[in-house]
């Protein structure tokens, strides 16, 4: 049980995947999902528990799935995809006893995901088939997919790749990721009319064909220590350009992820850690 209605206490688990941190709530006992105000309050790092996103464990929605999960950003908005969150939900379900065996399926707000337990605290998650057509991202003003787009933004031209991994991503290749204008350009692209649903913006540096470095400015959150779907997006955009191999290590400020994509209509597979931090109760 996650909540005690009489006392207002909310039970939770704090987790992270490569530094992308989450508050996990089990709603399968009938506890209602958080509204935008409660989600933002819970995610507040000064007055709440503090996290990038809230993950809610729910009853499965598809045949064969062991459970489903919802995603709430730190500003209270709902999200449809979260790769690091998928791994943390998988690990939570294994510890809870809901998920049995080495392979199982979980439902995100976007789709069902196949999960595989690896060594230690590592999990692999099938993240779906990347969508490059502008209408599917969505990216307005362009009729057909291309390797690189250009937009005039406040007097400068920003060049980027674009893809949907169940959520929209723009990928900006840079020479040095440490010096990338993550917050400034990230916020400008998110506010640009070309992205009607806003966009997650990744800044990626190719170290060598098997290794990239990445920083991500996320919708509804800002820059995070890691973004799983952002790592997938950066990898597949670079793979499409022939800049990296089909199996690539992605170094983020909070840790390491590995992204594999055979290409065409195959699913992207992301692997990385899912770490328990602590269990607690929040007096709301």
From Swiss-Prot:
Substrate binds at residues 20, 53, 73, 83-84, 167, 200, 218-219, 228-229. Pfam families: DAP_epimerase. InterPro entries: DAP_epimerase_AS (IPR018510), DAP_epimerase_DapF (IPR001653). The keyword Amino-acid biosynthesis applies. GO terms for biological process: lysine biosynthetic process via diaminopimelate. It comes from the Bacteria. Transmembrane segments: none annotated. Pathway: Amino-acid biosynthesis; L-lysine biosynthesis via DAP pathway; DL-2,6-diaminopimelate from LL-2,6-diaminopimelate: step 1/1. SUPFAM superfamilies: Diaminopimelate epimerase-like. Its main location: cytoplasm. Keywords: Amino-acid biosynthesis, Cytoplasm, Isomerase, Lysine biosynthesis. One of its GO terms (cellular component) is cytosol. Belongs to the diaminopimelate epimerase family. This is Diaminopimelate epimerase. It comes from Xanthomonas euvesicatoria pv. vesicatoria (strain 85-10).
